[in-house]
Every structure is written in structure tokens, then in C-alpha cells.
Swiss-Prot record:
Entry-linked InterPro entries: AGPR_AS, AGPR_type-1, NAD(P)-bd_dom_sf, NAGSA_dehydrogenase, Semialdehyde_DH_NAD-bd
Catalytic activity: N-acetyl-L-glutamate 5-semialdehyde + phosphate + NADP(+) = N-acetyl-L-glutamyl 5-phosphate + NADPH + H(+)
GO molecular function: N-acetyl-gamma-glutamyl-phosphate reductase activity; NAD binding; NADP+ binding
GO cellular component, one term: cytoplasm
Protein name (database record): N-acetyl-gamma-glutamyl-phosphate reductase
Matches recorded under PROSITE patterns: ARGC (PS01224)
Keywords from the UniProt entry: Amino-acid biosynthesis, Arginine biosynthesis, Cytoplasm, NADP, Oxidoreductase
Catalytic activity, EC: 1.2.1.38
């Protein structure tokens, strides 16, 4: 049986990264996976070669308009559309189609959170695509609807999940994530011009205003016996891609560095895509570039009485497209790690 895959939003950064990963997937090489319709809005009518010269294998493919009719007839549909647009398309696709949504439309469980941060009517919740979270891998196996997590919540959740579940910390965390400009997408913006970003760092959507704040709190709350307060600050850096997250929280009394390290090493011992670094080593965005890996370091600041956890991911791979392909693998029955690089690109 051949699985036919469509990508809506194929000309965006996430869509292009999904294509890159699918072309390296063993199922594509064997003929078990076929790349079907590639759609977008503003770039419809262009060839992929004009838009993505790094994908010469599909250079002659023409980008089509994004409609339910174009996407019908595929076994798997990846949605790389702006927030708020996915629901309209997804609701027109049949229940037998596996729909993997890279936008935020179906991530949040709390309707009030969605309406506060996104300003539209909540459309529901789908199985959430961080397989490393307790119970989520099982929910994703065979799932016909999947919500791919946000890039910031991925880095923050994987950094803090073991500490929260083990009760090492108080449920009050501070997260600072430094991100590359590709996280904002391809849309032209003065704030993202090279002359505005090069040689400069800038915090944005501070003081709890960023849309990923409730998603981080939701994820950590799943493994906590009480709600987790999250202070989240994103920082824009002059990098094409990558997220470096530093997360801190007050330690429970008596928790030692040895205990914290043991908790993290045990929690991630069987996880292919999370690597707890040796003591003293620090996560680097370059080390995970182009890979589906998350590198994590956990330390104790004894003077401050806090845990410090640092994580690094590629926002376009583990933070979006890699997670989407990982979820597809679980949904259709491929090996979970198929087609997903575990080695970064350096220098």
C-alpha cells in the first residue's frame, strides 16, 4: 500500500522542511510514500523550483491553491497554514484522512485560553504531538487528527517535564527562549529585515502576552498535581533557525544536583530524540541544526535555590516539521524515527 501525502502551505518554511524530511524518508525511497498535492495561497501557480532551490527533486511541481477539493484523495494531509485557517480546511476533510496540523488551532484544551490569545472561536482539541510526554505516544498511534506543538512549547516542555513530574520544583517557572527569525515565517516584515535583526537581540510579546504561554502551562500542568504558573519571554536573535531555552524554578527543599540529574537521565533514557548532555556540557543550537533532536542540560543553582534547565532545538525540525513527521510515523504505523535526522550540521 502506498500512502499519498499532501502539504498545504508547502511554500512556507515549515512546509519546505516537511518536504525535505519526506524526501529522505525510507518509505519515500521504497515507494510506500508518495508526495501528492503541494498547495499554498500567495505562491499558487509558481513552481517549487522557483521557491525552494534546495529541493531539486520536485522543482517542476506547480503549487496549487489550497482547497479541500485539492487535498481530497490523500491519505495524509499536513497543514502548514496560518493560525485560524486550519480548522476550516480540516473540517472539510473526511474522517479517514490523517490530518496533521502545524498551526495552533487544535492545541489548547481551554476554550477561554484560545479566545484570549487567538481571538476567535475555539474549534476543539486534537491529540497533541509531543510523543515524549507521558501518555501521548499511545494517543498518537493511529490518530487521524494531530495537533503539532508550538516550537517554544516543545523546547520548554522537554526542558521542564521531568522536574515537574518528579516534584523537584515549585509550580512556578520562568522560561526565556532565544529564537531564530524563521520562527516568524516567510511573510515580509520590517521588524525581520536584515538591517533590523543583524547584530541585535530583542525581547517581544513579554509579560505573558505570547500565545505559547498557555500551551507551556497546559503541558506542564498535565504532569503536576496543581496548576503551573509560567512566565515566558521570547527573544529574537539574528539566526536563521534554532531555539535555546533556559528555564528556572524554585527547588523543593532537599533536592540535590545528583537527584535532579538522575531524574532527567531516567526520564529520557528510552527517548530517541532527547539527549541529556554530560555534566558540564551546554546545549547549542548549532549542534541540533537540521535534526529532530533536543539537547538538554539540568543544573542546580545552590545559592539561588533553583533548578536551571537549558534545551536546544531546531525550531523548524523538532520544533515543527520534524514533530509533524514523527507524528505521521506514529499515526500510519511507520517506525517513529523514520526519516528524522539525529545528527546536526556543524559548523
Amino acid at each position: 500500500m502506498t500512502i499519498k501525502v499532501a502539504i498545504a502551505g508547502a511554500s512556507g518554511y515549515a512546509g519546505g522542511e516537511i518536504l525535505r524530511l519526506l524526501l529522505g524518508h525510507p518509505a519515500y525511497a521504497s515507494g510506500e510514500l508518495e508526495i501528492g498535492a503541494l498547495t499554498a495561497a500567495s505562491t499558487a501557480g509558481s513552481t517549487l523550483g522557483e521557491l525552494m532551490p534546495h529541493i531539486p527533486q520536485l522543482a517542476d511541481r506547480v503549487i496549487q491553491d489550497t482547497t479541500a477539493e485539492t487535498l481530497a484523495g490523500h491519505d495524509v494531509v499536513f497543514l502548514g497554514l496560518p493560525h485560524g485557517f486550519s480548522a476550516e480546511i480540516a473540517l472539510q476533510l473526511g474522517p479517514d484522512v490523517t490530518v496533521i496540523d502545524c498551526a495552533a488551532d487544535f492545541r489548547l484544551q481551554n476554550a477561554a485560553d484560545w479566545e484570549k490569545f487567538y481571538g476567535s472561536e475555539h474549534q476543539g482539541t486534537w491529540p497533541y504531538g509531543i510523543p515524549e510526554m507521558p501518555g501521548h505516544r499511545e494517543a498518537l498511534r493511529g490518530a487521524k487528527r494531530v495537533a503539532v506543538p508550538g516550537c517554544f512549547p516543545t523546547g520548554a516542555t522537554l526542558a521542564l517535564l521531568p522536574a515537574v513530574q518528579a516534584g523537584l520544583i515549585e509550580p512556578d517557572v520562568s522560561v526565556v527562549s532565544i529564537t531564530g527569525v524563521s520562527g516568524a515565517g516567510k511573510k515580509a516584515s520590517v521588524a525581520l529585515l536584515g538591517s533590523e535583526t543583524m547584530g541585535s537581540l530583542k525581547a517581544y510579546n513579554t509579560s505573558g502576552k505570547h500565545r505559547h504561554t498557555p500551551e507551556i502551562a497546559q503541558n506542564l500542568g498535565e504532569v503536576s498535581d496543581k496548576p503551573v504558573k509560567v512566565s515566558f519571554t521570547p527573544v529574537l536573535a539574528p539566526l536563521p533557525r534554532g531555539i535555546l531555552t533556559t528555564a528556572t524554578a524554585p527547588l523543593k527543599e532537599g533536592v540535590t544536583a545528583e537527584q535532579a540529574r538522575a531524574v532527567y537521565e531516567e526520564f529520557y533514557a528510552q527517548e530517541t530524540f532527547v539527549h541529556v548532555l554530560p555534566e558540564g556540557a551546554q546545549p547549542q543550537t548549532q549542534a541540533v541544526l537540521g535534526s529532530n533532536m533536543c539537547h538538554v542540560q539540568v543544573e542546580i543553582d545552590e545559592e539561588a535555590g533553583k533548578v536551571l534547565v537549558t534545551s536546544a532545538i531546531d525550531n523548524l525540525t523538532k520544533g515543527t516539521a520534524g514533530a509533524a513527521v514523527q507524528c505521521m510515523n506514529l499515526s500510519v504505523g511507520f517506525d517513529e524515527a523514520a526519516g528524522l535526522p539525529q545528527v546536526g550540521v556543524a559548523p
